[in-house]
Amino acid sequence: MEYASDASLDPEAPWPPAPRARACRVLPWALVAGLLLLLLLAAACAVFLACPWAVSGARASPGSAASPRLREGPELSPDDPAGLLDLRQGMFAQLVAQNVLLIDGPLSWYSDPGLAGVSLTGGLSYKEDTKELVVAKAGVYYVFFQLELRRVVAGEGSGSVSLALHLQPLRSAAGAAALALTVDLPPASSEARNSAFGFQGRLLHLSAGQRLGVHLHTEARARHAWQLTQGATVLGLFRVTPEIPAGLPSPRSE
């Protein structure tokens, strides 16, 4: 005890070296902090470089610019059925007309999905007895039909052929058609075309249980000289959304 006390009081005695334990503890923490900072900077640079690449890739995807986007009400581009297919909600039907003869009245349809051109997914069904397509779930649907005809008697027959879509329950007391199409046939002459084609489609709000039937009407002068082209006259629909955009016609509002 006396030796330690004397050495500490002697001004000429050399000072003991500073303890290194604290410096050894500080140095590793400084290195770790520096490494973490470098890693954070590297990660930030990687994110910065990746963001422009992701945006550029999204813009470059084929067809993305042309695909329609669901807006309010009638702005849904009903004249672009191919684009609306991008929006369909898994419910799709396409039926093919059975009879080729131009007989006025409700059309009968092939509904077996195993047949060419026929599709019928869950939530949709066809009633043979009433010749109607039945919708099980409410929503906004794009409904369409296509009419194709061919001349079977050369140089004869003109006029027009019409299709009209009717809904049950009825839209109104008058029972106006929800969708209509008229195809004018070329005149009976040697230069006339021997085929005719028409397409019509529309967005409709359909209720659960809604039934859709198509009626054919032909002018008498065309009935014997023209027929439906086999497999080319179709009725179809697909659901775009279960929501009802403002301003869209409903089954009971017209």
Curated annotation (Swiss-Prot):
One of its GO terms (molecular function) is tumor necrosis factor receptor binding. Signal peptide: none annotated. Cytokine that binds to TNFRSF9. Induces the proliferation of activated peripheral blood T-cells. May have a role in activation-induced cell death (AICD). May play a role in cognate interactions between T-cells and B-cells/macrophages. Its main location: membrane. It comes from Homo sapiens (Human). Residues 50-254 are extracellular. GO terms for biological process: cell-cell signaling; immune response; positive regulation of activated T cell proliferation; positive regulation of cytotoxic T cell differentiation; regulation of apoptotic process; regulation of T cell proliferation. GO terms for cellular component: extracellular space; plasma membrane. This is Tumor necrosis factor ligand superfamily member 9. Homotrimer. CDD domains: TNF (cd00184). Residues 1-28 are cytoplasmic. The keyword Cell membrane does not apply. It is a single-pass type II membrane protein. Keywords: Cytokine, Membrane, Signal-anchor, Transmembrane, Transmembrane helix. The keyword Cell cycle does not apply. It is found in: Membrane. Residues 91-240 form the THD domain.
